[in-house]
């Protein structure tokens, strides 16, 4: 039995990582057999719209700030934002996330409330960054949403590998380098000047 002493989200992340590492170790030692031809799908729904950031002392969006709350939970945005479920969803296959998406907020008043009252973004910042969107919503935007799938993850599962680097034609290294194209390559001073970028190389 394992115990984790931390905040709920951090404890879950630690124990989840421990579960995966333990399974990998047992498999390596021949104590556990993982079948790659047994497909177990799972939809993750109803997870919190907001998470509390202790460092910033405020709520942050669990998925993104445009995710719509579950209708019957919307009233809790004022009193208990952490209890509000979001209309976001992930599809998982054999423990690997294949895709995720959400239903978006389409009412200007609700979006403004999320920005200013819950996320504590100053009104002037909201107006400068998202004013165009809030105005567009006043013309009657319909409910909308979507989902994005990771085809590379699907192929990795079909091939029985745990790393998408094994199935990508030109995978990058952990440092973001493309070994085939030898990129990234150094940029010239002229290119940096055109983009008004100054670099400071550590000694």
Ranges and model annotations:
Residues 1-203:
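Structured aminoacyl-transfer and RNA-binding surfaces used for tRNA recognition/handling
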């Amino acid at each position: 039995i394992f115990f984790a002493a931390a905040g709920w989200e951090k404890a879950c992340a630690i124990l989840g990582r421990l579960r995966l590492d333990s399974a990998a170790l047992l498999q390596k030692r021949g104590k556990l057999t993982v079948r790659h031809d047994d497909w177990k799908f799972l939809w993750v729904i109803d997870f919190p719209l907001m998470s509390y950031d202790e460092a910033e002392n405020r709520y942050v969006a669990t998925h993104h700030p445009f995710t719509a709350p579950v209708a019957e939970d919307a009233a809790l945005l004022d009193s208990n934002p952490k209890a509000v479920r979001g209309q976001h969803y992930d599809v998982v296959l054999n423990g690997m996330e294949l895709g995720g998406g959400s239903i978006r907020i389409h009412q200007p008043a609700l979006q403004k409330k999320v920005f200013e009252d819950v996320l504590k973004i100053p009104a002037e910042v909201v107006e400068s960054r998202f004013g165009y969107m809030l105005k567009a919503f006043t013309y009657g935007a319909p409910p909308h949403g979507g989902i994005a799938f990771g085809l590379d993850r699907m192929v990795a599962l079909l091939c029985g590998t745990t790393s998408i680097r094994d199935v990508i034609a030109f995978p990058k290294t952990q440092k973001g380098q493309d070994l085939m194209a030898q990129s990234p390559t150094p940029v010239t001073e002229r290119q940096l000047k055109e983009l008004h970028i100054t670099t400071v190389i550590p000694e």
